[in-house]
Regions:
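Substrate-gating cap/lid alpha-helix
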Residues: 170-200
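Membrane-embedded segments
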Residues: 1-71
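A short, Lys/Arg-enriched amphipathic alpha-helix followed by its capping loop at the start of a domain
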Residues: 2-6, 150, 193
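Secreted/periplasmic serine-hydrolase-like ester/acetyl group-modifying domain
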Residues: 39, 52-160
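Second-shell loop/turn segments in exported
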Residues: 8-13, 130-137, 174-179
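N-terminal cationic-hydrophobic initiation segments that often serve targeting/anchoring roles
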Residues: 27, 151-152, 191-195
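Loop/turn elements at helix/coil->beta-strand transitions in domains of secreted/extracellular proteins
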Residues: 4-5, 31-34, 154-159, 198-200
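Active-site segments of SGNH/GDSL-like serine hydrolases
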Residues: 151-178
């Protein structure tokens, strides 16, 4: 679709700090021409230096000596190394596109979701989002520390940001919580900040 070679980097429920760590590694080791980045609004609600998952940083540095505890860990020796060795010489070209897929673990559709949900006809007062879309302080900090440094330091890299589609129930829950207008304003403000850069789509 976009040409070139891509690597899919996923962090389950990752914060923007988790994604920053992946970008740091990618840019420090490769010539990155294009970044496709799915922005989850919830990921921007974490403190900008807070990982949602602790990264074993010792595995990502250049010091081989501090990897000893990993390599000689009983679980790694007994389980993971044999699994890796069994795949030597094998090729599964589809695996790159299907890794981290978990959609088959769940049932989808209105018949699966709606029976457990009660809808209300009451009008919910929404939090005041202001007239002009403006990033909240938390969003600002995440964008300034975890997005913009890479966009600004790599003007030849094309950054393509997108919002993964949320279900209608997610938006209804935002309405029920009184944050629907605020969430939509945050999205709009984020779009305006990012699109100010020539290397962003």
């Amino acid at each position: 679709l976009f040409g070139g070679q891509f690597v899919k980097l996923c962090v389950n429920g990752g914060s923007s700090f988790d994604h920053k760590q992946m970008m740091e590694l990618a840019f420090s080791t490769h010539d990155v021409r294009r970044v496709l980045y799915g922005i989850d609004l919830d990921a921007l609600t974490y403190f900008y230096k807070t990982p949602n998952h602790e990264t074993p940083n010792y595995l990502y540095d250049d010091d081989l000596l501090n990897d000893v505890a990993y390599w000689f860990n009983a679980g790694v020796l007994a389980k993971y190394i044999p699994q890796c060795l069994m795949t030597l010489g094998q090729s599964d070209p589809d695996q790159v596109d299907t890794m981290y897929m978990w959609s088959d673990l769940f049932t989808y559709g209105k018949d699966a979701v709606l029976p457990g949900y009660t809808f209300s006809t009451r009008r919910v007062e929404q939090r005041d989002a202001g007239e002009k879309p403006t990033l909240s302080y938390q969003f600002q900090m995440n964008v300034q520390h975890n997005f913009l440094p890479y966009i600004e330091q790599h003007p030849d890299t094309q950054f393509m940001f997108f919002f993964p589609p949320y279900s209608l129930l997610s938006w209804y829950q935002a309405y029920e919580n009184g944050t629907l207008e605020l969430d939509l304003h945050q999205k709009q403000a984020l779009i305006e900040v990012l699109l100010a850069y020539d290397n962003v789509q």
